[in-house]
Design a protein with these regions (language model features):
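Conserved, mostly hydrophobic/aromatic
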Residues: 18, 75, 121, 233
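A short alpha/beta connector and helix-capping loop motif
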Residues: 24-55
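Charged helix-capping and loop-helix junction motifs
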Residues: 30-31, 134-140
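Acidic (Asp/Glu)-rich catalytic clusters
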Residues: 35-39, 60-73, 112-115
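Catalytic beta/alpha-barrel core
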Residues: 46-51, 96, 130-133, 147-157
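Glycine/small-residue-rich loop that forms an oxyanion/phosphate-binding "nest" at active or ligand-binding sites
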Residues: 80-120
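Active-site rim beta-loop-alpha module in soluble metabolic enzymes
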Residues: 157-215
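C-terminal alpha-helical cap/extension of soluble enzyme domains
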Residues: 189-261
Length: 261
């Protein structure tokens, strides 16, 4: 079953996107398509230095998020800018905890400068996938959220979901509109054909289905139950703005509203 916030009997679904990731060759912030994406979302996952982002990008993206009334989240990552945080790292848990704390704190400072606050944590890339099954790294991520009293985004059924419940952390289950799923409910690796869903009509159709009956068709055709609170489109997916517009239209057409939890 699909679960999300309800107000006066009307379901409210969050829509999120990864922002603050566009860097030029020397590594400085050059801006991206945030101005086009922010009006389409209710939560912004802001890169905070692990895989991308710097002080300027964090400050500017947070300022735009505040202007649009969009919730700010820390998109923490393995410390691996070279591979954009998409390579798994066998890093010791204490070192990972130190890195994630620094990333989170940097974003908190940037948000505060522009009158914003960080409301949640979302792991990025390889870390997101690792904490589905890796206990020690899942513990680091959940403890970060618990320590700062914020929510945590993640995959339904992951180790982070279980640990979040134990520590009293609000866990917001995420569904990806632009990513294909395997039959076990995990994301299809980006290296495999069909891992990305870039057709707006296809994104709209699968969004309509998951909101209406709580199911996703896996890459192999299997029908999988999908519980979620927030829907993601990656900003680096081709045509991200068009895909987000398709998600919004599909959600609203079901009678649900869009907004942060």
């Amino acid at each position: 079953m699909t679960h999300s916030t309800e107000t006066a009997g009307v379901r409210r679904i969050d829509v999120n996107c990864d922002l603050g990731e566009a860097l030029d060759a020397p590594g400085g912030w050059r801006g991206g398509h945030e101005p086009a994406l922010l009006p389409l979302i209710s939560s912004a996952n802001v890169a905070c230095g692990g895989h991308a982002g710097d002080a300027r990008s964090m400050r500017e993206v947070c300022a735009m998020a505040v202007q649009h009334g969009v919730r700010i989240g820390a998109q923490v990552s393995y410390p691996d800018r070279e591979h954009f945080g998409r390579r798994a790292l066998d890093i010791a848990a204490p070192l990972l905890a130190e890195s994630l704390e620094e990333q989170f704190s940097d974003l908190v400072a940037a948000a505060a400068e522009v009158g914003g606050r960080v409301a949640y944590v979302k792991p990025h890339g390889a870390l997101y996938n690792a904490v589905v099954t890796r206990d020690d790294h899942a513990a680091v991520v959940v403890e970060l959220a618990a320590r700062h009293g914020v929510s945590l985004f993640g995959l339904h059924g992951s180790r982070t979901a279980t640990r979040a419940t134990t520590l009293g952390v609000r866990f917001e289950r995420e569904w990806f509109a632009d990513r294909a799923y395997l039959a076990d409910g995990t994301l299809t690796p980006r290296s495999e054909p069909g891992a990305l869903v870039v057709d707006a009509a296809a994104v709209a159709a699968r969004t309509t289905r998951v909101v209406s009956d709580g199911h996703t068709v896996a890459l192999d055709g299997a029908l999988i139950g999908t519980a979620f609170d927030t829907i993601c489109v990656h900003s680096d997916t081709r045509g991200a703005a068009e895909l987000l517009a398709a998600v919004r239209a599909a959600v609203l057409a079901t009678g649900a509203t869009i907004g942060a939890a």
